[in-house]
Amino acid sequence: MSKVVHTSGKRKTAIARGTVKEGTGRVKVNRKPVELYEPELARLKIFEPLELAGDIVNSVDINVRVVGGGIMGQAEAARMVIAKGLVEYTGDMNLKDRYVQYDRTMLVGDPRRSESKKFGGPGARARKQKSYR
């Protein structure tokens, strides 16, 4: 039986779930090959963990499904799933260290969320100006 690893990752309001299993190096995000992912900046973000991993990528298939959030939030959530999945699949601590040194958010989530808007102004903190005359 082949080894299958399920992982999940979040960024802002985007949630990604993915599987890493034995294969031929195919990487798909929302059922599309990652090479066709647009815009280019988001595609490059998703490619980062694959390039840092080296030859390991050619022996696994990665499928990622992302929902919610915006384009870059989804890209960073997918990137986290790929990085976590490869580390768990290989069990390689050197790979984990390489990811952490490159960018810690590849493996560790970013807890920041946007603050909700309150009444009395246009945003979360901004208020209507007062005139004292």
UniProtKB/Swiss-Prot annotation:
Family the entry assigns: Belongs to the universal ribosomal protein uS9 family.
SUPFAM superfamilies, alphabetized: Ribosomal protein S5 domain 2-like
Transmembrane segments: none
Cellular component annotations (GO), alphabetically ordered: cytosolic small ribosomal subunit
One of the Pfam families matching this protein, by short name: Ribosomal_S9
The protein's name: Small ribosomal subunit protein uS9
HAMAP family assigned to the protein according to its UniProt record, in alphabetical order: Ribosomal_uS9_A
Annotated GO MF terms: RNA binding; structural constituent of ribosome
Keyword annotations from UniProtKB, A to Z: Ribonucleoprotein, Ribosomal protein
Keyword Cytoplasm: no
InterPro entries, A to Z: Ribosomal_Su5_D2-typ_SF, Ribosomal_uS9, Ribosomal_uS9_archaeal, Ribsml_uS5_D2-typ_fold_subgr
Single GO biological process annotation from the record: translation
